[in-house]
Amino acid sequence: MSHAHGTRIQEHIGDPVSDAPPVSREKLEEIFQDIQADLRFDHELNGCLNCGICTATCPSAHYYDYSPREIVQLLWTENLEGIYDAMQEKIWACAQCYTCAARCPFGNSPGGLVMLMREVAIKHGMESARNVLRPFSRVMLKL
């Protein structure tokens, strides 16, 4: 921040928690294309009425800042920035119980979509994936 005539001017606006550089549009598109290219994608995402049944029945939504409906909407609308943001933390809150899929009137599987997003996060070496998998690294070395 610099001071000009007694006022504070913020020179850089970014994530206050992370010093990571902003993600390019090309990288966001590549991540979404990797999710969309998976053969399971079209089976897991069939449309969305935005009814919220998936979120109302989701155990993780009761305890975390997580909404299966949000995941479906982000992917359905191809909101690249929102998808990337969700891959930083939200997708790791899903318990993979698939209650959302059992209850969805459209036959969507938000849990299945989250699994795809997790796999892509690992493939792209996202920090969120490394943080989640770090505790397992010692176990894997012992196998």
Map each language-model feature to its residues:
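Flexible, acidic/Gly-rich N-terminal and inter-domain linker regions that tether
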Residues: 1-50, 54-55
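Ferredoxin-type iron-sulfur electron-transfer modules in oxidoreductases and energy-metabolism complexes
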Residues: 21-39, 63-92, 97, 108-143
